[in-house]
Each structure stands twice: as structure tokens, then as C-alpha cells.
């Protein structure tokens, strides 16, 4: 052996590992440079490496910054205080002040349709409207009190409604009569249990503000005509809007903006729009707040309420928008919807949005006037007072492009990487994240069901944030422990040339891709009608996730290589910074090797050793692509929809289930962007997450679901049944099961004094209703007892008809309800103990004296609505009418009703009779003079308001607070 050979063998031996491989041991220097060479590196380079290298400290700082920024920016975006400013212009300030005064006067007391306070509000608004209209010659006013806009029509299957309208309608005639008009609409009635500040006093006050604005001297005549509908009785059937469809002015209208309130204060949100063509004009609003997530929620019936938008869009075929307050729902329709719980900024947000939007549409011709564009649903949102809207066809097109382009680029990149870069991914690396993700969701679901729901199922009502935080912490911890546990257990099978971060990014991108396919298919299936308009968020999240994945693959593909010389002059290309561990690998061993060296070095090994530090900075670009924006979007819009839904858990067990599903989904979606980096986070993140989880557990156990700020919402109805002997007088309180209703009722003074029994019965969908004998109401002056409140007199009995069994049976009756506006009739055939519905084919509402009215022949009357020679309203439906709802304006006029019906043929010798059940409703709250004393009209309701705990609010269970029942046979 020559000396050279001996030296070569010695050198080779010094680099031979115990397993016979030719790797350089970690404790032996690889470069010829001295260890001090890195120490003498430029200070700036070292600072950059320390700050932006893929280190635990750098990553941890970015994680904390992202979480904090997500929460703070979302709070700013939804905050009325920070995102909306009061007007500085004197004229606008004056308009706001006047509108606020109007709101205070409207909300002085409860003013449902069946109350004298409703008349007071009507007359008050009429005075203001008359004063403002007189300021401009091109303004005019019409009042439906002339009874020309009453209707009798089918409003539900087998239900017919009679309604007398007293809408207040203003027309601001435009300078160009050829332009179709814009309708602005709000309703001035409230429910019996609410002062109606947000629902819909703010809408009415905003319309008064619009009138103030256009009647001002400095405001010129608009080019487009504006019609304003101050409508009544929206709460129990949208009847004011329905009546307006038959008004002569309605024919001019093509567009509308409806102002509503389904919460109590806060910011007014654009939550529905008929189409993109009209929704895009909301960009003119100075403080836009919008989300088509609510549009999708309404389409899916996740929110159990409706607005006038429904009739304007569906029956009126108008193009328009729905702008409404939406939180908190537990104060909605209760006495807490009052002036004390709102402020001027809330009113200004709706008022300024109405002014800005109206000016943007009425200033001149818009593209929808001249182009017969098809209505195309829109996806829209707002961020920091910037409004974004796109048609659903655009969302569909982008989705299709992404579904094709991203997989194509990714697959080509992967093929090139595996072919030339030798990126090896072991089965453990490939399967551990999907396994961890699925198992974590399974564990989260069981944790939610077996702990959170069982311990405090109503907690989202007051502390949805605590639950979301606990779920988020649990999900992150589960993935952290599972992923690192798998790495620990299967460390021998862990590949050496891989990037765990990139693998997880690609797998999450694939999950979003599958979800995008599902969403796109649904969009196409719904024919782009907006049922899935909230899913544009999925498109944005996929773009961000895919961008991080594609960027990582391209970095792998185009990574610069360095060459290492062997002793026989062979060249070995190596990936810079990541040889054994691969691109982006997270190695942090201490040593003296500089992975940033770029020159070729002559060594006597075939493979280079693993780098001791990873100074690649492209990870930070991936992080910025994926985490901050995705985290903000997921949290901001997830929390927004949760704010609108969380209080609905008081309405049914189904809603409770949906709320907890939304909480789990929010936690998972917000956590997903952080999961690719979970391998690298500092132990501080782990400890903080544990602390948050433990804190959440404690809070879930001890927190109260119902507080004064987040009350328990119960519903009230007092029912007096005159058919019973003696009459029954039951108070019914309805709410969620296991929500302490019985305990609240048993503590009432009247219940304890009379030793009345409180009986509770379970109802469908997790609800319960409790009944007890209540205090007698005093509903009308001069009535001595309940029998004086309601009487039904049969004027023409069908039993005397000679047409049976081959012809129509008919009957007439008169209902006298003292000081009343609302009744409901139910028709059932009564034959030998058998009862059937749908036998009535024609109903007649007599407007004049019965003596001057002829019998209506059902064979001659047309199907649907008609009027006879005396102006009586006739409705015929041969499929059957089961219910007739009556709404009149005259407090003292009796209801005079005629029916024609067909009896069923059976073997009974008894001639059939028609049972008519009459339910009349009273809703007036306050006091009344009776026998020289001032007494409460509905003392049972007043007692509940006074003696219920401060964490309880009361709403009406039906269209009135007191229901008096009586039935007759016709």
C-alpha cells in the first residue's frame, strides 16, 4: 500500500459511521473553515437569520402576532364604536338629531297593530310627513285609511287573510319620469311585548331622515322618483307590504331598499340582495357592513323570521336589498328593545347608509334601467368599510379555474421534484396528518357532546367566545400531541428527505379542493340563485392555502444547488440548505457547519451531512400566504354568523344543535392555517394553549348561560276559554326545556297566594310550556267579565239548508269583540263526533250591513278573490279553507262573516254542522280606569315583568298577549 492510499484509507475511515455509511458525524466539522468563521459573519446577516430563519422563536412570534391581529382586527371591523363616526356636517347632524327625536317618540310605548299606541304612532308620523312634504312641490303623500287597499287573499296553504291597511306613503317625484322608481320601506308597528326601537323604529326614523334630507333647501330634486312606504302590521304576516303591492304607485317601482331590525342595536348589515346588478350600488355607502353569509343562512331557514323583502322580491318581482340590525337576538321582540339599549351611532349607521345608497341610485340613469339584464345572485362582503361584490357566476368560474389549474401545477411540480430532486415522503409522514386531523375532529365532537353540552348546554347564549376558545385550544392540542406523538413512536420510519410543513400544506389544500368541488356543484345545482352565496369564503381560503402549497413546491423545484467534489473528481449536486432533510426541513442542531456556504468543497464523501441550522426564509412567505389572512377571514366571518345565530338556541333544540356545530366548525377552520407549522412551535405556545384550554374548562363549568346582558327569553300568552264551564283562565309561559321556567312561575306572588299549581308539558323540539291560573285581565272599558269581551251570534244556520246532501251549505255569523282588531277563525266539520278540515270552500267578509247583502253563490264566484255587488270581499278556494285571519282598523265594528261549505258524505243520519272556533287577541299594555280605579290591563303579564329575575325577558307567544276563545256550530 502506498502512502497516498494509506492517507486515503485513513481519511475514509475517519468518516465512516457505525452503520457503515459514509456520513460525516455531527461532532466533526464538514468545512475546512474554522468554527469561528460563522461567528465573524456580518451582523446584519446574523440578525436576519435570527429574526427570519425557520426557528421556533421566529415562528412563535408570528403565531402570537397573527392570533392577536385576527382578534383585534375582527373586533374593529364589527365594532360600532371604532368603525362608524358621527356626522361632522351640520346639516347631517341636524337630520340625525331630528331622527333620534322621532325614534324616542315612536318608542315611548309598545305599539303593535292591535293597540291604540299604534294609532298614536301613525298619527304622529302623519303629522311629520305632512310638514316635510309641504316643503317641496314635487313631494306628495297618500294614506291607506281610505280603505282602498284592504285585501282578502290566501297567505298560507288553506289560510285566507283579511287585512285593512293604513300605510303612510310618500312620493318624491323625480325630474325624469321615464326612470323607474326606487322604493324605501320600513314598518312602524312593533310586537306587543317590545318598544320596537330596533325593530323597526330605526328604520322608520331613517325614512324620516331621508324625507328631511330631500326636503332641505340645499337638496335638489332627484332624477329618479323615490317612493317611501311607512307600512303597518309587518310583525304578524308582512301585511303592510302585501297591501302596498296593490297600491297604484307600486306600478312605477323597479327597485327597493328595505330597512329592518332583527336584533337590538349595533351595526346595520346588508344581509340579502336579489341580484348582483343592484347590490353593486351598495358601494356608495360610507360605512358598508355586509355579508352574503346571512343570505345563505336565510335561504337555509337557519333564521326563523322574515321581512318585507320577501313580498317585494317574490310577489312584487322587484330588485332590491335588505338592510337590518341583527344582534343580539335575545333582546329582539322583548322590552329590552328600547332606547336605553341603543345609541345615536346605530341610528346614524342605518340612516347614513340609506342616504348614501339612495343618492347613488336616484342621481340619474343606471345600467339596470336600459339593459334587460337577468337577475344574477351576488356574493358580497365588507372589510374595514370597503365593500366587495361579485356575481355568483364569477365565483363559479373562479372555482372551476382553481379546481383545474392548482392541481395541474401541483402535480407537474411534484412529478418533477420526485423525478429529479429525490424528495422522499414516507408512509408515516404522508398519513400522520390526515389521521391526526380526523381523530382530532372525532375527539372534539365527543368532548363537545359529552362534556360541554351535558354540563352547560345554554352557555353559547352568554359565552360563545369561551366555548369557541376552548374548542380551538382542544383541537390544536389534540393535533399537536397526535402529530408529535406519531413522530416519537415512528421515528425510525421517518423519512430523511421531506418537509413536514409542505406535506401538511398540500394535504390541507387537497381538503379545501374537495370542499370546493362540493360547493361549486351546489352553486350550479341552485342555478346561481344565492343559496350558496356565503361559500365564496371557501374560495378565498383555498386560494391562500393553494398559494402556500404551490409556492413551496416551486421553491423545491427551483432551489439552487451546490456541488461537492469527491476525491476522484466526481461532482455531486446538493440542494442548498437542505440536503438530507430536504427543502424547508426543520433542523436545529448545534454545530459548526455553515449551510449558507455556496462554494464547492472537496471532500472524500459521497453524501453531504445534514445541515445544523436551517436559514431558509421562504417559510415566512408561506406563513404570510396562509396564516394571517386565512385566520382573519375564518374568524371574522365565522364569528359574524355565530353572532347572528347563537341566540337562536333558545328557540329549539335543532337550533341549539346548529349553534354547537357552528362553534366546532369555527374552531376547526380558524385552527387549520396554523397546523402546518405546529411541528415547529415553541413550548410557550404549547403551554399557553394548555392554559387557555384549562381556563375554558373552568369557565364552562361555572359560567351562567343567562345574565342581565344575555337574558333568558320566555314567551307569554293568557288564554280565556269561554267554552269551558267555568271558564278557564290559563297563563302559558313557553321556553326551552330545563331552563327553570317552572321555578320562576312558582315564585310569583299570585301563584303562591292562591296556591295555584304550575303544570309543565314537554313540546316538540326541546321546548316546554308551563300553565297556571292567571289574574283576570281588564281589556276593555265597561266589560264586567270575560263573557262581555267576546260574543258570536249565528245569523244564518247551515242546518236549515235544503241543499244537503247534494249542494253547498252556507251560514252567516257575527263576531263582537270589544275594543279589538284581530281575530282568527278555524273551520272544522262536526259530524257524529268526527271532525275534518278543509270543507269550507268560500268565505265572505261583509263590509256593509248584512240586510243589504245577497247570498253569494259559490258556483258563480270565481276562484280566488272577488267582490260582490255590495263591495263585500269574497274568497273561493275549492281545495279548502281551514283558517280565516281577520285584521280591521275600526275598534268597535263587529266582524260579519259568511261561509259556504261542502259536507262529507257518510252513513250518519245526523245532518252535519260546521264548527267555527273563534280566537280573538288583545295586545294593549298599560293601565285602564275601571270602577274609579286605575288597574293594569293585563296584570298577569305585568306581574311577570315585575317579579321575574333580571336575567329573564318576556316576548309574546302569539300575535296578542291575551286570547279569548269561543266556538259555535253553524
From Swiss-Prot:
Top-rank taxon, per record: Eukaryota
Binding note for cofactor: Binds 2 Zn(2+) ions per subunit.
Region (Disordered): 1-35
Protein's recorded name: Vacuolar membrane protease
Organism annotation: Meyerozyma guilliermondii (strain ATCC 6260 / CBS 566 / DSM 6381 / JCM 1539 / NBRC 10279 / NRRL Y-324)
Topological domains annotated Cytoplasmic: 1-56, 419-423, 487-502, 557-620, 680-683
Residue sites binding Zn(2+) 2 per the record: 199, 235, 333
Record field: transmembrane: 57-77, 398-418, 424-444, 466-486, 503-523, 536-556, 621-641, 659-679, 684-704
Its membrane topology: Multi-pass membrane protein
A single Gene Ontology CC term: vacuolar membrane
Localization, UniProt: Vacuole membrane
EC class name: hydrolase
Gene Ontology molecular function, alphabetical: metal ion binding; metalloexopeptidase activity
Pfam families in UniProt: Peptidase_M28, PFF1_C, PFF1_TM
Binding site for Zn(2+) 1: 187, 199, 260
Amino acid at each position: 500500500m502506498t502512502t497516498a492510499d494509506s492517507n486515503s484509507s485513513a481519511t475514509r475511515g475517519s468518516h465512516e459511521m457505525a452503520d457503515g455509511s459514509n456520513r460525516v458525524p455531527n461532532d466533526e466539522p464538514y468545512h475546512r473553515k474554522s468554527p469561528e468563521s460563522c461567528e465573524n459573519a456580518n451582523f446584519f446577516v446574523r440578525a436576519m437569520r435570527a429574526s427570519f430563519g425557520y426557528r421556533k422563536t421566529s415562528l412563535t412570534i408570528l403565531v402570537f402576532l397573527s392570533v392577536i391581529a385576527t382578534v383585534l382586527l375582527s373586533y374593529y371591523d364589527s365594532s360600532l364604536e371604532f368603525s362608524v363616526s358621527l356626522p361632522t356636517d351640520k346639516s347631517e347632524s341636524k337630520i340625525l338629531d331630528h331622527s333620534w327625536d322621532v325614534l324616542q317618540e315612536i318608542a315611548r310605548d309598545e305599539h303593535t297593530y292591535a293597540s291604540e299606541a299604534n294609532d298614536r304612532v301613525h298619527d304622529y308620523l302623519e303629522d311629520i310627513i305632512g310638514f316635510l312634504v309641504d316643503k317641496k312641490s314635487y313631494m306628495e303623500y297618500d294614506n291607506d285609511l281610505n280603505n282602498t287597499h284592504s285585501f282578502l287573499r290566501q297567505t298560507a296553504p288553506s289560510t285566507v287573510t283579511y287585512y285593512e291597511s293604513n300605510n303612510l306613503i310618500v312620493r318624491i317625484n323625480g325630474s325624469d319620469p321615464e326612470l323607474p322608481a326606487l322604493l324605501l320601506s320600513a314598518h312602524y308597528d312593533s310586537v306587543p311585548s317590545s318598544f320596537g326601537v330596533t325593530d323597526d323604529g330605526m328604520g322608520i326614523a331613517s325614512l324620516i331622515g331621508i324625507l328631511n334630507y330631500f326636503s332641505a333647501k340645499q337638496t335638489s330634486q332627484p332624477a329618479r322618483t323615490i317612493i317611501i312606504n311607512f307600512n303597518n302590521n309587518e310583525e304578524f304576516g308582512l301585511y303592510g307590504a302585501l297591501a302596498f303591492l296593490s297600491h297604484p304607485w307600486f306600478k312605477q317601482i323597479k327597485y327597493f331598499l328595505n330597512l329592518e331590525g332583527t336584533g337590538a342595536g349595533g351595526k346595520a348589515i346588508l344581509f340579502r340582495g336579489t341580484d348582483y346588478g343592484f347590490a353593486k350600488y351598495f358601494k356608495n355607502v360610507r360605512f358598508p357592513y355586509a355579508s352574503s353569509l346571512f343570505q345563505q343562512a336565510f335561504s337555509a331557514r337557519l333564521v326563523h323570521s322574515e321581512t318585507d323583502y320577501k313580498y317585494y322580491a317574490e310577489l312584487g318581482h322587484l330588485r332590491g336589498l335588505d338592510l337590518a340590525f341583527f344582534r343580539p337576538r335575545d333582546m329582539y321582540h322583548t322590552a329590552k328593545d328600547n332606547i336605553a339599549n341603543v345609541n345615536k351611532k346605530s341610528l346614524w349607521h342605518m340612516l347614513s347608509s340609506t342616504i348614501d345608497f339612495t343618492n347613488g341610485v336616484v342621481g340619474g340613469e343606471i345600467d339596470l334601467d336600459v339593459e334587460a339584464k337577468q337577475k344574477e345572485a351576488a356574493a358580497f362582503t365588507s372589510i374595514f368599510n370597503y365593500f366587495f361584490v361579485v356575481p355568483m357566476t364569477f365565483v363559479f368560474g373562479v372555482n372551476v379555474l382553481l379546481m383545474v389549474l392548482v392541481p395541474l401545477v401541483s402535480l407537474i411540480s411534484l412529478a418533477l421534484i420526485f423525478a429529479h430532486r429525490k424528495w422522499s415522503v414516507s408512509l408515516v409522514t404522508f398519513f400522520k396528518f390526515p389521521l391526526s386531523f380526523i381523530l382530532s375532529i372525532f375527539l372534539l365532537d365527543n368532548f363537545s357532546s359529552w362534556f360541554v353540552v351535558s354540563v352547560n348546554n345554554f352557555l353559547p347564549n352568554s359565552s360563545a367566545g369561551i366555548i369557541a376558545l376552548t374548542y380551538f385550544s382542544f383541537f390544536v392540542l389534540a393535533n399537536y400531541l397526535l402529530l408529535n406523538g406519531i413522530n416519537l413512536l415512528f421515528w425510525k420510519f421517518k423519512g430523511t428527505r421531506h418537509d413536514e410543513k409542505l406535506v401538511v400544506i398540500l394535504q390541507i389544500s387537497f381538503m379545501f379542493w374537495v370542499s370546493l368541488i362540493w360547493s361549486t356543484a351546489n352553486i350550479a345545482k341552485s342555478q346561481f340563485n344565492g343559496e350558496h352565496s356565503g361559500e365564496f369564503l371557501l374560495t378565498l381560503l383555498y386560494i391562500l392555502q393553494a398559494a402556500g402549497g404551490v409556492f413551496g413546491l416551486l421553491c423545491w423545484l427551483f432551489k439552487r444547488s451546490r456541488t461537492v467534489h469527491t476525491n476522484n473528481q466526481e461532482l455531486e449536486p446538493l440542494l442548498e440548505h437542505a440536503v438530507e432533510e430536504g427543502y424547508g426541513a426543520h433542523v436545529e442542531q448545534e454545530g459548526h457547519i455553515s449551510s449558507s456556504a455556496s462554494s464547492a468543497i472537496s471532500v472524500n464523501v459521497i453524501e453531504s451531512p445534514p445541515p445544523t441550522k436551517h436559514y431558509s426564509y421562504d417559510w415566512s412567505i408561506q406563513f404570510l400566504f396562509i396564516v394571517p389572512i386565512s385566520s382573519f377571514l375564518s374568524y371574522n366571518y365565522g364569528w359574524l354568523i355565530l353572532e347572528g345565530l347563537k341566540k337562536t338556541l333558545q328557540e329549539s333544540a335543532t337550533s341549539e344543535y346548529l349553534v354547537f356545530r357552528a362553534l366546532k366548525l369555527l374552531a376547526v377552520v380558524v385552527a387549520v392555517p396554523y397546523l402546518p407549522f405546529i411541528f415547529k412551535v415553541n413550548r410557550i405556545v404549547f403551554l399557553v394553549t394548555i392554559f387557555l384550554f384549562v381556563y375554558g374548562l373552568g369557565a364552562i363549568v361555572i359560567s351562567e348561560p343567562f345574565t342581565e346582558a344575555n337574558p333568558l327569553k320566555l314567551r307569554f300568552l293568557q288564554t280565556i276559554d269561554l267554552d269551558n264551564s267555568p271558564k278557564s283562565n290559563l297563563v302559558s309561559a313557553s321556553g326551552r326545556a330545563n331552563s327553570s321556567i317552572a321555578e320562576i312561575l312558582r315564585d310569583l306572588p299570585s301563584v303562591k297566594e292562591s296556591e295555584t299549581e304550575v303544570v309543565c308539558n314537554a313540546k316538540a323540539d326541546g321546548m316546554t310550556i308551563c300553565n297556571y291560573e292567571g289574574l283576570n285581565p281588564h281589556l276593555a272599558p265597561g266589560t264586567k267579565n270575560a263573557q262581555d269581551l267576546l260574543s258570536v251570534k249565528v245569523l244564518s244556520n247551515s242546518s236549515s239548508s235544503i241543499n244537503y246532501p247534494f249542494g253547498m251549505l252556507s251560514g252567516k255569523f257575527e263576531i263582537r269583540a270589544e275594543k279589538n282588531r284581530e281575530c282568527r277563525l278555524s273551520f272544522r266539520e262536526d259530524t257524529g263526533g268526527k271532525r275534518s278540515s278543509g270543507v269550507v270552500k268560500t268565505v265572505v267578509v261583509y263590509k256593509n250591513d248584512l240586510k243589504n247583502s245577497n247570498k253569494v253563490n259559490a258556483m258563480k264566484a270565481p276562484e280566488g278573490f272577488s267582490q260582490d255587488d255590495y263591495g263585500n270581499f269574497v274568497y273561493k278556494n275549492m281545495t279548502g279553507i281551514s283558517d280565516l285571519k281577520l285584521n280591521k282598523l275600526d275598534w268597535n265594528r263587529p266582524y260579519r262573516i259568511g261561509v259556504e261549505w261542502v259536507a262529507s258524505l257518510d252513513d250518519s243520519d245526523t245532518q252535519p254542522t260546521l264548527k267555527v272556533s273563534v280566537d280573538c287577541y288583545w295586545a294593549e299594555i298599560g293601565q285602564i280606569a275601571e270602577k274609579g280605579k286605575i288597574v293594569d290591563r293585563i296584570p298577569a303579564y305585568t306581574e311577570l315583568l315585575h317579579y321575574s329575575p333580571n336575567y329573564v325577558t318576556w316576548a309574546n307567544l302569539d300575535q296578542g298577549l291575551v286570547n279569548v276563545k269561543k266556538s259555535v256550530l253553524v
